[in-house]
Amino acid sequence: KEGYPMGRDGCKISCVINNNFCKVECQAKWRQSDGYCYFWGLSCYCTNLPDDAQVWDSSTNKCGG
């Protein structure tokens, strides 16, 4: 599984071309994962996630309230 990790506010975690920052963010939530900064979305994107990982989903987006 892969997807955008969420911050406490339910929003995607923003980044500006900083793969190491995103890798740390992903691994803080899911130890075996990897991550990078998705350039077009300017958001962190995680890979190698467990099937039950909760990631940002446009259909259940609660970002911004």
UniProtKB/Swiss-Prot annotation:
User: Any keyword Cell inner membrane?
Assistant: no
Tissue note: Expressed by the venom gland.
- Residues in LCN-type CS-alpha/beta domain copies: 1-64
Subcellular localization = Secreted
Q: Which GO terms describe its molecular function?
A: sodium channel inhibitor activity; toxin activity
User: Which InterPro entries does the record match to this protein?
Assistant: LCN-type_CS_alpha_beta_dom (IPR044062), Scorpion_toxin-like (IPR003614), Scorpion_toxin-like_sf (IPR036574), Scorpion_toxinL (IPR018218), Scorpion_toxinL/defensin (IPR002061)
Which Gene Ontology CC terms are recorded?
A: extracellular region
Keyword Disulfide bond on this protein? yes
Keywords recorded for this protein, A-Z: Disulfide bond, Ion channel impairing toxin, Neurotoxin, Secreted, Toxin, Voltage-gated sodium channel impairing toxin
Q: Which SUPFAM superfamilies match?
A: Scorpion toxin-like
Report the main location listed first in the record.
secreted
Report the sequence similarity comment from the record: Belongs to the long (4 C-C) scorpion toxin superfamily. Sodium channel inhibitor family. Beta subfamily.
Domain-level remarks: Has the structural arrangement of an alpha-helix connected to antiparallel beta-sheets by disulfide bonds (CS-alpha/beta).
Q: What is this protein called?
A: Putative beta-neurotoxin RjAa4
Q: What is the lineage of its organism?
A: Eukaryota, Metazoa, Ecdysozoa, Arthropoda, Chelicerata
